[in-house]
């Protein structure tokens, strides 16, 4: 039975700045939801940033939504499934919902002595690990960084791009490392459909895909772009639910989908999107949001499902953090092992949690 919900706040430094088309991150402000039960606790990580630049959600907004609207819905017998149904009338706020759902799911699976991977239907014990490379200061730095990641064993490289920093980046990486490496690009919605002729130059480089080239609400633009270029179009920010995924596929706005649980409201919805894509033969992969070990563990369970046929952004902990909040995930022969113990399979290290503060405790009403 659920007894209380706690909010935990803290921060963690990144080992190096991570620059995208919408800004540069040097650290992460963190929000964890801790679901307290009779015998176990569950943890969920919020993926929202401190500013509403990736999406309209941001960390302080999530704190308020969780505290004012989501927690009061909970009862002692609440489950992740019942919470999703109860929270449905609240529009949007997917990252807030996903944060609470993850904690509830971790708790109930620990009570049931089932791993998240088994619950979701995973059929892999390890997943291929890709790495996301932020925009660098110059091409020499880019070549150095990509070379270091390939030496560490990453099986796929994703380059962040933006107008004025795109074609030459890809050309340089292909020239330096050859056509054999798996390579894709991510625009984070930095272009418009008027850039189609420019983006068509990417066709020469045999990319796996171009991720979210246009604004998230421009499905018509993505349809037109997909008709004009040969590089497969993958949607990220545009996909916020099963319905938006179905709509994008019906319109042929994309041929690949990046599934991020935090962006779609949680792991239950992410599983539905996976199942839809699997039924249609559409490849999916699991994106990253600079998660610590709490979110990374859960993402590994999701990425172990059969439809995840492309390497995702689930990198080793050391890619982002000198020391993670949980025991670190490591890359071995290009893969990361999927946790197979109960729940998400990891817990915060006590010495790391000591740097965090429990900022709120909400007792859950009895039925």
State what each model feature region is.
Residues 156-163, 184-189, 206-216, 232-240, ...:
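Catalytic beta/alpha-barrel core
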Residues 45, 101, 211, 237, ...:
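Acidic-residue sensor for enzyme active/binding pockets
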Residues 217-234, 239-335:
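Shared catalytic-loop signature of beta/alpha-barrel
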């Amino acid at each position: 039975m659920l007894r209380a919900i706690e909010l935990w706040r803290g921060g963690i430094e990144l080992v190096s700045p991570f620059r995208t088309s919408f800004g540069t991150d040097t650290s992460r402000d963190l929000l964890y939801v801790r679901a307290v039960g009779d015998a176990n606790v569950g943890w969920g990580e919020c993926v929202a940033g401190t500013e509403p630049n990736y999406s309209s959600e941001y960390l302080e907004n999530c704190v308020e939504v969780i505290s004012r609207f989501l927690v009061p819905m909970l009862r002692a017998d609440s489950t992740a499934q019942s919470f999703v149904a109860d929270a449905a009338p609240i529009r949007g706020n997917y990252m807030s919902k996903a944060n609470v759902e993850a904690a509830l799911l971790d708790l109930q699976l620990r009570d049931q002595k089932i791993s998240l991977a088994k619950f979701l239907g995973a059929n892999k014990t390890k997943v291929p690990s890709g790495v996301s490379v932020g925009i660098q200061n110059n091409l020499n730095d880019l070549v150095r960084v990509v070379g270091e990641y390939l030496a560490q064993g990453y099986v796929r490289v994703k380059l962040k791009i933006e107008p004025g920093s795109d074609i030459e980046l890809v050309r340089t990486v292909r020239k330096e490392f050859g056509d054999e490496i798996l390579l894709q690009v991510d625009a984070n919605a930095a272009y418009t459909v008027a850039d189609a002729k420019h983006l068509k130059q990417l066709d020469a480089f045999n990319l796996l895909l171009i991720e979210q080239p246009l604004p998230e609400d421009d499905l018509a633009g993505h349809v037109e772009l997909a008709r004009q270029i040969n590089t497969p179009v993958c949607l990220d920010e545009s996909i916020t639910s099963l319905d938006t995924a179905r709509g994008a596929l019906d319109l042929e706005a994309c041929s690949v989908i990046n599934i991020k649980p935090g962006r779609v409201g949680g792991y239950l919805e992410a599983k539905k999107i996976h199942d839809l894509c699997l039924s249609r033969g559409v490849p999916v992969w699991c994106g990253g949001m600079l998660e610590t070990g709490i979110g990374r563990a859960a993402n590994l369970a999701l990425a172990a499902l059969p439809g995840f046929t492309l390497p995702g952004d689930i990198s080793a902990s050391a890619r982002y953090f000198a020391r993670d909040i949980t025991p670190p995930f490591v890359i071995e022969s290009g893969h990361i092992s999927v946790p197979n113990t109960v729940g998400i399979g990891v817990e915060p290290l006590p010495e790391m949690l000591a740097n965090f503060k429990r900022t709120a405790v909400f007792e859950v009403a009895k039925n």
